[in-house]
Amino acid sequence: MDYTLTRIDPNGENDRYPLQKQEIVTDPLEQEVNKSVYMGKLEHALHDMVNWGRKNSIWPYNFGLSCCYVEMVTSFTAVHDVARFGAEVLRASPRQADLMVVAGTCFTKMAPVIQRLYDQMLEPKWVISMGACANSGGMYDIYSVVQGVDKFIPVDVYIPGCPPRPEAYMQALMLLQESIGKERRPLSWVVGDQGVYRANMQSERERKRGERIAVTNLRTPDEI
């Protein structure tokens, strides 16, 4: 079988992810509250209850590509105990999972497989890109490695590092839970575009920039 690498054209017509239609809008529930106090508050409570159940029962797909996967499964040990976040139920089938963690190097031959597995996951579903290789290709600036999995699937949380520690993976789960808690999805089955409203989350780099600039006493590499 012949494999070819097709470059992404950001100006081309493409209605598939990650080049899907996105726009910044206000929270639709705020408009409903102003229209009807009772129904608006009821819908707000229903969304909060559903999102609470979703964010505390994330089932990750047992899927690893490289050494970052070793750090991911380390978080399932008793030392880290990722079960505290409700994400310890590993699924061997994408149809039973709602979180895909792309942990490792994504080669061009593997990209169609990841794409197909992502398509087999049911909504709601989320993606975590774990490690420098999955985020941007890492040190493999070569034709055979995809320079970031967000070239063909949408990514919700990026974990930097080569490889990241298990604590970084658990922090990503907490950030994903925070994002899920602010989502607005249809409360019933929807065929086609669901029209999901996601909160505009601030990146950790921007959030911690002021704190890092204020640091004056830097520890030596010999200190922990």
UniProtKB/Swiss-Prot annotation:
Family statement drawn from the similarity comment of this UniProt entry: Belongs to the complex I 20 kDa subunit family.
Cofactor field: [4Fe-4S] cluster
Cofactor note: Binds 1 [4Fe-4S] cluster.
Any single GO CC term annotated in Swiss-Prot or TrEMBL for this entry: plasma membrane
GO molecular-function terms, A-Z: 4 iron, 4 sulfur cluster binding; iron ion binding; NADH dehydrogenase (ubiquinone) activity; NADH:ubiquinone reductase (non-electrogenic) activity; quinone binding
Main location: membrane
Protein name: NADH-quinone oxidoreductase subunit B
Function: NDH-1 shuttles electrons from NADH, via FMN and iron-sulfur (Fe-S) centers, to quinones in the respiratory chain. The immediate electron acceptor for the enzyme in this species is believed to be ubiquinone. Couples the redox reaction to proton translocation (for every two electrons transferred, four hydrogen ions are translocated across the cytoplasmic membrane), and thus conserves the redox energy in a proton gradient.
Organism: Klebsiella pneumoniae subsp. pneumoniae (strain ATCC 700721 / MGH 78578)
Superkingdom of the organism of origin: Bacteria
Residues binding [4Fe-4S] cluster, per UniProt: C67, C68, C133, C162
One of the GO BP terms on file: aerobic respiration
Subunit structure: NDH-1 is composed of 13 different subunits. Subunits NuoB, CD, E, F, and G constitute the peripheral sector of the complex.
Membrane protein topology class: Peripheral membrane protein
Class of the enzyme per the UniProt entry, highest EC level: translocase
E.C. code: 7.1.1.-
